[in-house]
């Protein structure tokens, strides 16, 4: 969607209530964070997301949503051309520049991610190694030690299921964000 790239990036990091009208992050970034949170909620509630979370059982069930999100990022990067005419590399470069332009340095007390490094991070999701790097990063942010990296094997083994879910989930998320009526489910069309 057309929203703040910095807000989308900060959506998982910035916690608590945000009022865009008074936020030190600025109205555009604050709105981007709120949109990111809405998209996350909608994605987590999507039937295909729920189905993919079912692939992870036992002690990993608690982290299934995170792994599915990263697995879907991997699937989207791998199937990018099916959803966007702009090459992934060009998109990643454009997005990294936008993040830098919007970044609320004063409010956060730190600089935006380096353009080239951030663009490589995004395009890195095309490879399984990009997914494992993301899972390792999540491990470092968790309060309790959890070994998430091996769960990438499940995503790889179920790659077709993840790649098949990307399109319907994206369509439904865009429809919800743009307030369009839902498309009939496959079973309803038959």
Which stretches of residues belong to each language-model region?
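An amphipathic alpha-helical core segment
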Residues: 90-175, 179
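Active-site-proximal alpha-helical scaffolds that flank and shape metal-associated catalytic sites
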Residues: 52-116
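Alpha-helix initiation/capping motif
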Residues: 1, 26, 46, 83, ...
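An N-terminal structural lobe/cap that precedes and organizes the functional/catalytic core
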Residues: 1-80, 154-189
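Short, surface-exposed acidic
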Residues: 22, 83-85, 146-148
